[in-house]
C-alpha cells in the first residue's frame, strides 16, 4: 500500500479553448495513444455544439458536466460479516472525474454514426438535463438516498 497520496499533477490548459476541462475530456476520449484523433473528435464535437446552440461550447460543456457531477455515492463497508452500502460525499476532483468518465462511457454507447456526433449530442443532452450520463447521476443519488440508514457507518 502507498505510504502517502501521490501528488496531483497540474492539468495543462487546452491550446484552442484555454480550458482544463477540455484537456481532461481529450485525455478521457484518448485510445491507443492517438491524441490527435481524440483532439479532432473533441474539437469537432464542440464545434457541432457551437453550431446547434449558438453559444460558447466550453460553457455548454461546463453546464453538461455540472449536470452529471454526483454529490453523493455509495461505498461498500464490511461490518461484522455484513456488507453495507454506505452513502458518502464525493470530493470535487472525484466528482469531476466521474462526470467525464460517465460522459465518455455513455457517448460510446450511443447509436449515431460518428463519434463526433455522439459526443456532441451527449454533451447537448447533458446540458439540458437529459441523456444517459445524467440518468447515471440520478441513479447514484437514488442509491445513496436509499441507503441513508447506513450513513452512520461512514468513515
Curated annotation (Swiss-Prot):
Q: Which UniProt keywords apply?
A: Ribonucleoprotein, Ribosomal protein, RNA-binding, rRNA-binding, tRNA-binding
Q: Name one GO biological process term.
A: translation
Q: Which domain of life is it from?
A: Bacteria
Annotated GO CC locations: small ribosomal subunit
Q: Which SUPFAM superfamilies match?
A: Ribosomal protein S7
In terms of NCBIfam families, this protein maps to: rpsG_bact
Q: What is this protein called?
A: Small ribosomal subunit protein uS7
Q: Which organism is it from?
A: Corynebacterium aurimucosum (strain ATCC 700975 / DSM 44827 / CIP 107346 / CN-1) (Corynebacterium nigricans)
Top-level taxonomy: Bacteria, Bacillati, Actinomycetota, Actinomycetes, Mycobacteriales
Amino acid at each position: 500500500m502507498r505510504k502517502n497520496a501521490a501528488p496531483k499533477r497540474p492539468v495543462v490548459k487546452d491550446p484552442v479553448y484555454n480550458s482544463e476541462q477540455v484537456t481532461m475530456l481529450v485525455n478521457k476520449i484518448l485510445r491507443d495513444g492517438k491524441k490527435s484523433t481524440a483532439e479532432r473528435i473533441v474539437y469537432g464535437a464542440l464545434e457541432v455544439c457551437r453550431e446547434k446552440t449558438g453559444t460558447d461550447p466550453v460553457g455548454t460543456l461546463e453546464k453538461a458536466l455540472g449536470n452529471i457531477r454526483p454529490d453523493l455515492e455509495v461505498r461498500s463497508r464490511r461490518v461484522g460479516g455484513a456488507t453495507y452500502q454506505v452513502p458518502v460525499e464525493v470530493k470535487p476532483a472525484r466528482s469531476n472525474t466521474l462526470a467525464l468518465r460517465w460522459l465518455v462511457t455513455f457517448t460510446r454507447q450511443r447509436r449515431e454514426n460518428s463519434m463526433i456526433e455522439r459526443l456532441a449530442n451527449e454533451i447537448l443532452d447533458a446540458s439540458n438535463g437529459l441523456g444517459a450520463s445524467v440518468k447515471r447521476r440520478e441513479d447514484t443519488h437514488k442509491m445513496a438516498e436509499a441507503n441513508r440508514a447506513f450513513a452512520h457507518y461512514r468513515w
